[in-house]
Amino acid sequence: AMVNFRMSKGIVGRLWTSSVAIGRQHGFDIQVFGETGGFRWASEQPNQLIYTPVGGRTQIIEKGEAGLYEDARRLSRVAIAHPEGFPLAVANIYCDIADSIRGETRDALPTAASGLRSIAAVHAAVASAKAGGAWTNAVPPMFRS
């Protein structure tokens, strides 16, 4: 499936997903391109974030390097050079829930509103596919301005 979407401030995104991409086993990549550069992260190299500034040299940012944000260090559970995987990502959410229950909120938890937006996006993708790929509004009515 190919999903095109618009976010706030005119940002355009594209999501491609397939369960039958020949030669890829659980491949999951995220790429972000903007006016000043681009980032790429791939599940096959989970400890690296590739950053390329416009007009500059590509840089590989490794897990555990000095200068990373506190959340990047806090959410890393295993030693450098060892991938963490999906189960530990979910465990981080559980830890954030426990912190929230103790009153140590970081505003990192998903909200009911973000869940509703996610469900609306899936429903819009299905409706668009049934309509031959027509552009479909994915914003729930209560969030429309």
For each feature predicted by the language model, list its residue ranges.
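Hydrophobic, well-ordered secondary-structure elements that form the walls
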Residues: I97, G115, G132
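Rossmann-like dinucleotide-binding domain that binds NAD(P)(H)
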Residues: A1-H26, A113
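Short linear motifs in exposed loops
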Residues: W16, A42-S43, A138-V139
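C-terminal glycine/acidic-rich active-site capping loop/insertion
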Residues: A1-K9, T36-L109, S145
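C-terminal hydrophobic helical "lid"/dimerization subdomain
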Residues: L116-A129
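C-terminal capping/lid region of NAD(P)-dependent oxidoreductase domains
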Residues: A127-S145
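Short glycine/proline-enriched turns and hinge-like loops at secondary-structure junctions
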Residues: Q25-G27, S43-E44
